């Protein structure tokens, strides 16, 4: 369950971001376009790898039939 304090923090985060003055970061450099594109591409690849791993782990596995027999539930036979 999410703690109510966390929800309040998430709601107030845009307000705090709006209060900061632009250029208040000392020593921060701007990101070049190739670096930004590389970060976005790496994030997309990492996301696809995570989705693939979850898909492989979550899909149902087929159990092999024993001795070539398949069990079929047929009431009344027995």
From Swiss-Prot:
It is found in: Membrane. Residues 71-74 are annotated as: PIK3R1 binding site. Residues 19-34 are extracellular. The modification Phosphotyrosine is found at residue 71. Residues 1-18 form the signal peptide. The keyword Oxidoreductase does not apply. It is a single-pass type I membrane protein. Phosphorylated; PIK3R1 and GRB2 associate specifically with tyrosine-phosphorylated HCST. O-glycosylated. One of its GO terms (biological process) is positive regulation of phosphatidylinositol 3-kinase/protein kinase B signal transduction. The chain crosses the membrane at residues 35-55. Residues 56-78 are cytoplasmic. It holds the Pfam family DAP10. One of its GO terms (cellular component) is membrane. GO terms for molecular function: phosphatidylinositol 3-kinase binding; signaling receptor binding. Keywords: Disulfide bond, Glycoprotein, Membrane, Phosphoprotein, Signal, Transmembrane, Transmembrane helix. Homodimer; Disulfide-linked. Heterohexamer composed of four subunits of HCST/DAP10 and two subunits of KLRK1. Interacts (via transmembrane domain) with KLRK1 (via transmembrane domain); the interaction is required for KLRK1 NK cell surface and induces NK cell-mediated cytotoxicity. Interacts with PIK3R1 and GRB2. Interacts with CLEC5A. Forms an CLEC5A/TYROBP/HCST trimolecular complex depending almost solely on TYROBP. Interacts with CD300H. Transmembrane adapter protein which associates with KLRK1 to form an activation receptor KLRK1-HCST in lymphoid and myeloid cells; this receptor plays a major role in triggering cytotoxicity against target cells expressing cell surface ligands such as MHC class I chain-related MICA and MICB, and UL16-binding proteins (ULBPs); these ligands are up-regulated by stress conditions and pathological state such as viral infection and tumor transformation. Functions as a docking site for PI3-kinase PIK3R1 and GRB2. Belongs to the DAP10 family. This is Hematopoietic cell signal transducer.
């Amino acid at each position: 369950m999410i703690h109510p304090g966390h929800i309040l923090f998430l709601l107030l985060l845009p307000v705090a971001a709006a209060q900061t003055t632009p250029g208040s970061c000392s020593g921060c450099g701007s990101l070049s376009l190739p670096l930004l594109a590389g970060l976005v591409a790496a994030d997309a690849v990492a996301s696809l790898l995570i989705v693939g791993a979850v898909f492989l782990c979550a899909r149902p596995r087929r159990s092999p039939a024993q001795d070539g027999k398949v069990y079929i539930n047929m009431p009344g036979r027995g």
